[in-house]
């Protein structure tokens, strides 16, 4: 795994915050049902043999090779760390880390003091295209 290169930017209060270089994205990518077969936590014995989605593997590795930050963000638990890391390695995924314990059930709505973008996976990974959409924001 490559080291992530940040610059420190000072805010109005004098605090230094890590900032990615221009054009570099932080990807948070689900595992089950997104880069491979959808396996529920209740069936961990299937995780080691889950089918990989080849287009997802190619796109994730392309983003990594382009210098983007790749983290898998999964509802799997820490108890699934070993089988998850082995599966990712077996299939050749390039990534910087894994965050376990994502809330289950879907219907996610991210709130952050940084720009947040989300892309719903609908069965195939491709390059992104621009599309106009309505988004929910806080009332100014």
What name fits each language-model region?
Residues 1-140:
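HAD-like aspartate-dependent phosphatase fold
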